[in-house]
Amino acid sequence: MSNLINGKIPNQAIQTLKIVKDLFGSSIVGVYLFGSAVNGGLRINSDVDVLVVVNHSLPQLTRKKLTERLMTISGKIGNTDSVRPLEVTVINRSEVVPWQYPPKREFIYGEWLRGEFENGQIQEPSYDPDLAIVLAQARKNSISLFGPDSSSILVSVPLTDIRRAIKDSLPELIEGIKGDERNVILTLARMWQTVTTGEITSKDVAAEWAIPLLPKEHVTLLDIARKGYRGECDDKWEGLYSKVKALVKYMKNSIETSLN
């Protein structure tokens, strides 16, 4: 487990715990805060990442109620009220222990899905390669908000499956680059570091790792993304699309080379 960076549990995490206790009751195995809050510290635009482990599948009505209640406490992207966005993942422990790839998630809440939620769509259970990385992060670096240490209820994710998850997630990530330049660039840097070193770090630390490995013409853009993530500059991407594409192509090729 990990120590909290700033010594304070984010308010949205506390509110999430209250909501899932109310909705799930005795079916909760554990609730864990992970991600930036416990690994490098929350940055200006960081989500609050919460993993909820339950012991059975969620009925449709429960997933609907969970979505509706999380929408009231999660900050919309770009809000000026200092309310952080939530990313809440729910898994049924029996679907991931014993381990199998790709892992199955029971539910996910994220602000990039708010438009779908507002239209009444509810996230269904699905197999998700990226969940392998989420579970590896949570098992290694998390704080229990409820229940035992995450390492006692989650099995270790094999590095081979983390590498498979990166390979399988790469196409969809790159397809979403327009309008999400910073996140895509930094996620690629983190993927590159992970497939090369086996470590999963924060996005800004991954960028610091990658910058010395880049050709000079790509360094500035990755550093802009890193500084924007840290709140050290107002990163603007208008007029830079061709350069962004070139950087993305370089990192994608580097990731694929490491995977092979």
UniProtKB/Swiss-Prot annotation:
UniProt keyword list: Antibiotic resistance, ATP-binding, Nucleotide-binding, Nucleotidyltransferase, Transferase, Transposable element
Originating gene: ant
Signal peptide span: none
Catalytic activity: spectinomycin + ATP = 9-O-adenylylspectinomycin + diphosphate
Protein name per Swiss-Prot or TrEMBL: Spectinomycin 9-adenylyltransferase
Lineage: Bacteria, Bacillati, Bacillota, Bacilli, Bacillales
Record organism: Staphylococcus aureus
GO MF, any single term: ATP binding
SUPFAM superfamilies, alphabetized: Nucleotidyltransferase
Function: Mediates bacterial resistance to the antibiotic spectinomycin but not streptomycin.
Gene Ontology biological process terms in this record: response to antibiotic
